[in-house]
Amino acid sequence: MNKRKSCATYLYQDSLARRMKELGVSRSELATMTGLSPSTVLTACNGRPVSVRTIAKILEHLQVDSSEEDDFWGIDPV
């Protein structure tokens, strides 16, 4: 179970970092845009668990639409 959780964490961290780089958004800018605290954004960027609400805010502000969410999170469609 821990191995699987670690894999998902790295996929999320990599996807978030890639999207931020594509858009030219820093962690502090993301914190300002989302209204989240800088420490919460840092937690998300480090691949640690964050709430669904936090993930929704990040997705909204990084302009990830529902059609590309699976690719963003590294999820293979079933």
Task: Set out the residue ranges of the language-model regions.
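DNA-binding alpha-helical recognition surfaces that contact promoter or target DNA
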Residues: 18, 32, 43, 57, ...
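A short, Lys/Arg-rich alpha-helix, primarily the initiator
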Residues: 1-29
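Short, basic-rich loop-to-helix N-cap that marks the start of a DNA-contacting helix
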Residues: 43, 47-60
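Short alpha-helical DNA-recognition segment
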Residues: 22-43
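The DNA-recognition helices of helix-turn-helix-type DNA-binding domains
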Residues: 37, 48, 62, 76
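Residues that mark the N-terminal boundary/hinge immediately upstream of a DNA-recognition element
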Residues: 15, 26, 51-54, 68
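Short C-terminal boundary/hinge segments that cap the last helix of small helical domains
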Residues: 63-78
